[in-house]
Amino acid sequence: MNILENINTEKRNPRSLHLDSMSIAEAVSLMIDEEYGVIEALKEQHRNITEVILATSYSLKNGGRIVYIGAGTSGRLGILDAVECPPTFSVDYNTIVGLIAGGEKAFIQAQEGAEDDANFGKEDLQSINLTAKDIVVGIAASGRTPYVIGALEYANSIGATTVAISCTKQAKISKYAKYSIEAVPGPEVLTGSTRLKAGTTQKLILNMISTLSMVSVGKVYQNLMVDVKPTNQKLIERSKNIICEATGVDYTTAEKFYLKANKSVKVAIVMILNDCDYEKALAILKNNNNFIKS
């Protein structure tokens, strides 16, 4: 039996049948045009994406974690999104977690066969002490990866919330999740190479999940990353500029309050907006569940 026969990501793209004989310029134009399918796929899944983000936000607000899990490109994209959150939002590295079939070494070198064992998905979730407060986001472009199915089955068994993200309709993994996103950008220019449009589609979904979940817990003021962690010179300067933008003060004043606030952008903004000292600003934030109220 051909298990890939009816999977969207395995179909041939009629527009790229002669990819091997196109000029580079023609192929570039084709690949650019094909990306429009990504946006259409996301628009079609607007309601489902919204429901997932409401669920991930609920988990974070109630002390849970967002756990991405996938194999190959899907797993790497989950890790990529997860590791960007601590410097951007000053969250713990355990708040948004990325797991990949085959372990960390699989991020840079493919681990053959790791995705084919459902038990590995279960074991990886057990290794991070998954709880019912957490939400597990299974990612599989083909919608059928055993590693992801095993993870979702285990998550369901302990009462964790489950999400399935795929790039094919009637995906097998959707049957194992409370919420599902089936965003289908169309056949790949290079048949079956889901690191292309499917990967782009998944990355944009993860961007929305992490960013808007962080907005929901007060990590953003207006459209400013007020909980940024200033770990290098660029981020230090960005921190001061954020204070300027949020409060209207000049650079020198922003720098002064940045230091007074122990290099916390959020606290500095509250100090300026409320004309108060450091301790009072902390109390205001605590009273507002760490949201800046203008």
Curated annotation (Swiss-Prot):
SUPFAM superfamilies (alphabetical): SIS domain
InterPro entries: Etherase_MurQ, Glucokinase_regulatory_CS, MURQ/GCKR, SIS_dom, SIS_dom_sf
Pfam families in the cross-refs: GKRP_SIS_N
Cross-referenced Gene3D superfamilies: 1.10.8.1080, Glucose-6-phosphate isomerase like protein, domain 1
Coiled coil: none
Record's catalysed reaction(s): N-acetyl-D-muramate 6-phosphate + H2O = N-acetyl-D-glucosamine 6-phosphate + (R)-lactate
Any GO BP annotation: amino sugar catabolic process
E.C. number(s) listed in UniProt: 4.2.1.126
Family statement: Belongs to the GCKR-like family. MurNAc-6-P etherase subfamily.
PANTHER family: GLUCOKINASE REGULATORY PROTEIN
Additional record remark: A lyase-type mechanism (elimination/hydration) is suggested for the cleavage of the lactyl ether bond of MurNAc 6-phosphate, with the formation of an alpha,beta-unsaturated aldehyde intermediate with (E)-stereochemistry, followed by the syn addition of water to give product.
UniProt protein name: N-acetylmuramic acid 6-phosphate etherase
Species annotation: Francisella tularensis subsp. novicida (strain U112)
